[in-house]
Amino acid sequence: MQIGLDFNLVEDLVAGVDEVGRGPLCGAVVTAAVILDPARPILGLNDSKKLTEARREALFDEICEKALSFCIARAEVEEIDSLNILQATMLAMQRAVEGLHITPKLALIDGNRCPKLAVPAAPVVKGDSQVPAIAAASILAKVTRDREMSAFELIYPGYGIGGHKGYPTPVHLEALARLGPTPIHRRSFAPVRAAWEVREGVTDSLI
């Protein structure tokens, strides 16, 4: 039995939903919805941020194998910029729940608000540390997004994306100012917008 997680909430057809990637300056926001199988418990579930990368990777495979149903979804950079990050996150969560091949009786959403869903839903603050299905969803979402950021490191070298995963670290902000935004940067985010405006200003001065 794991301290901190309420295993009474591992019930038939309860989906846990979480997101990763609201704060970064680049890349998609990734969500996951997971319905765990009470007959096939997964040991070691916890908030993905509290686990090592190796442990997350191992749990990712175990969750995919043992869950009754799971779906990983996303909202792309273009959607984030057109909708705003909150609405894009809600859309991505909605896609994750709708993508489950089993309809849950209840969706438990990490955080303090719920997307519009066709099934009953409830928010759970710090749910990734309390509800096993939300913890599982956080692991699927984080591993998926981290893998994407590692791939972008090869496509857009010089930004350190593989290390900071797109978050606004000093290394990232310095590279953004020096190299300018890439196509995967969120132009609606202030540091990216500022770097883009500087870039456009330089271009205009050369015309």
From Swiss-Prot:
The keyword Chloroplast does not apply. One of its GO terms (biological process) is DNA replication, removal of RNA primer. Pfam families: RNase_HII. One of its GO terms (molecular function) is manganese ion binding. The keyword Lipid metabolism does not apply. Its cofactor is Mn(2+); Mg(2+). GO terms for cellular component: cytoplasm; ribonuclease H2 complex. Keywords: Cytoplasm, Endonuclease, Hydrolase, Manganese, Metal-binding, Nuclease. A divalent metal cation binds at residues 18-19, 110. It comes from the Bacteria. Endonuclease that specifically degrades the RNA of RNA-DNA hybrids. Belongs to the RNase HII family. This is Ribonuclease HII. It comes from Pseudomonas putida (strain ATCC 700007 / DSM 6899 / JCM 31910 / BCRC 17059 / LMG 24140 / F1). The lineage of its organism: Bacteria, Pseudomonadati, Pseudomonadota, Gammaproteobacteria, Pseudomonadales.
